[in-house]
Amino acid sequence: HRLLEINGGVSEGDTQGTMHFERNEKQPLEADVVIIDEFSMVDIYLMNALLRAIVPGTRLIIVGDVNQLPSVGPGNVLKDMIQAEFCSVVRLHRIFRQAAESQIVMNAHRINSGEEISLENASPDFMHLERKDSASVINVVVQLIMQKLPPHVDASPYDIQVLTPTRKGELGVEHLNQVLQQYMNPADAGKVEREFHGVLFREKDKVMQIKNDYQIRWTKKTSLGDVYEEGTGVFNGDTGIIREIIPVAEQVVVEFEEGKMVEYEYSQMDEMELAYAITIHKSQGSEYPAIVLPVLGGPKMLLGRNLLYLSLIHI
């Protein structure tokens, strides 16, 4: 979206008719080579816009994992292109993120092959902890996040991500966020808090942008508060920390990666939700030092092969 200089739309819910790309056949991209990563997330509308903005002679290199979830929008472009066999395809087999003997790697391959995964806890990067009920599962999740995993992976509890296939239920996003908020960012007289759309937010909460907002302004400031860089756009899946809630101004200040500060009006907080736990789908395109995946049965459609595979490859 940013490469093609989207203009006009505010969120991912807008229709295709309300937004357009500045880059097209009349004002194409000025590049000899265009490389697109995480291509499984591209739908047919975005692919069409991309091709219109590329002039003949430009090389287009597409990088993606066909085993990940397809785009939220219509189409399964990456898979269809590979199956159509009309362009050159190179399959990469060597993995650099984990060691070859990693159980993460082994189990990811087994999931793709439809085989039973190994639960032997034979390597330090993959642990399976069995519990019989949701209360016991939640207790283990809290212990892992707050005590056991941070020293094991040398990361803050805020960097460790809980992934779950569903939003509802005891092990869904909504309930897990309430529980984890109590442990990771408990109420304190020194923290301002406020409820928006039925969810309690407080200063120092971990949050996620859940809609593409191409117009919202962000700034980067020095320690003295002087702005040295600014721009627009916060996107679906971006995570940050609430630094300040200002009741007088009716604003919530969120710091995103690379020090980008965004001032949300209270009316814009429908674009935000707690992010101690997120759905597996929302995690696509991200990477974490460790993840915790609480699963206790459920509908088969929520425990599909591509969801389990996607949850493993983020580490």
Question: Where do the language-model regions lie?
Answer:
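Conserved nucleotide-binding/hydrolysis modules and their immediate coupling elements
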Residues: 43, 181-182, 186-309
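Conserved helicase motor core of P-loop NTPases
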Residues: 66-232
